[in-house]
């Protein structure tokens, strides 16, 4: 009798790459050099997450045949690459704004909690052979983490150029999560 629970070679390749990307993102965020600026700290901790999203999308595009999921991944990858460029361009201005010590502590505490929850949820997605389902379930907590961190940063004074980037991230990532959940629901796949 055949074991129907075995992971396919395609799923194994996808998952191995996924976990490498997740581990690299966690290391990149952890290694970010923090300063006395919430704006700076948000940017240097967000860039590894945006780069990871691009790699997650490319990983899916290597194996997916689902046109709708592929188009979503292509859009997300393009937007995330643009976000990295915009954040890197804003970094010099962000460095000019020094944040009060209390604000720094409060922001960083919340950002760390959000990141830990995101990593846990991304790592806890049940493994399976439907890589499109895996991708959507893995990317939803990534989007939620980005949205929550952007909302948190907006509670404090940030550089003038960063504020519109944060509002855009909240809007875009909220829409993307809605689209991903709708894709899962339309196909009869559960979101968790």
Task: Give a label for each model feature.
Residues 1-192:
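All-alpha RGS (Regulator of G-protein Signaling) helical domain and cognate RGS-like helical scaffolds
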């Amino acid at each position: 009798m055949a074991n129907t629970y075995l992971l396919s070679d395609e799923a194994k390749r996808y998952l191995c790459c996924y976990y490498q990307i997740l581990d690299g993102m966690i290391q990149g965020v952890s290694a970010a050099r923090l300063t006395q600026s919430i704006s700076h700290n948000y940017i240097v901790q967000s860039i590894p997450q945006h780069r990871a999203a691009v790699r997650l999308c490319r990983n899916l595009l290597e194996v997916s045949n689902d046109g709708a999921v592929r188009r979503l991944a292509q859009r997300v990858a393009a937007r995330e690459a643009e976000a990295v460029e915009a954040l890197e361009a804003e970094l010099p201005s962000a460095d000019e704004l020094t944040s009060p010590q209390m604000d720094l502590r409060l922001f960083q505490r919340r950002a760390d909690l959000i990141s830990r929850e995101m990593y846990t949820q991304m790592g806890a997605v049940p493994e399976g052979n439907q890589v499109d389902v895996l991708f959507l379930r893995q990317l939803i907590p990534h989007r939620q983490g980005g949205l929550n961190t952007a909302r948190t940063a907006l509670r404090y004074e940030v550089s003038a150029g960063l504020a519109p980037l944060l509002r855009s991230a909240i809007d875009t990532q909220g829409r993307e999560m809605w689209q991903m959940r709708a894709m899962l629901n339309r196909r009869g796949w559960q979101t968790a």
